[in-house]
Swiss-Prot record:
This is Small ribosomal subunit protein uS8. Coiled coil: none annotated. The lineage of its organism: Bacteria, Pseudomonadati, Pseudomonadota, Alphaproteobacteria, Caulobacterales. It comes from Caulobacter sp. (strain K31). Belongs to the universal ribosomal protein uS8 family. Keywords: Ribonucleoprotein, Ribosomal protein, RNA-binding, rRNA-binding. InterPro entries: Ribosomal_uS8, Ribosomal_uS8_CS, Ribosomal_uS8_sf. GO terms for biological process: translation. The keyword Ribosomal protein applies. It holds the Pfam family Ribosomal_S8. One of the primary rRNA binding proteins, it binds directly to 16S rRNA central domain where it helps coordinate assembly of the platform of the 30S subunit. One of its GO terms (molecular function) is rRNA binding. The gene is rpsH.
Amino acid sequence: MSMNDPLSDMIARIKNAATRKRAKVATPASKLRARVLDVLADEGYIRGYSLVEKPGAFPEFEIELKYFDGEPVIAEIARVSKPGRRVYSSIKDLKPIKNGLGISILSTPKGVMSDSAARDANVGGEVLCRVY
């Protein structure tokens, strides 16, 4: 099966697993997904992830979801920039998500980072997704 937007697929898997209160979710591995998962782990939205390689199969990431008082820490995760409509933002245009309680994940010339890290580095870029 071909996949047009692997990042949207990962976001949908995380959303579905959190709704079903799963402890872990698997998704095919890629460099972009790894960098987005690094940001989610650094910001405290997931416990972590590990690379699982099975013989004769493509490598996968096993993502450990995080819960607080039985509720998922990721209340909402949504793709912003899509293959059909790319969304770019400068530093001035980056608005806080949910009054600073959420983050935007950006792909910048300096790598994939959160909106606060992008402000510190003074770089804009493609807004991949929003998390709160």
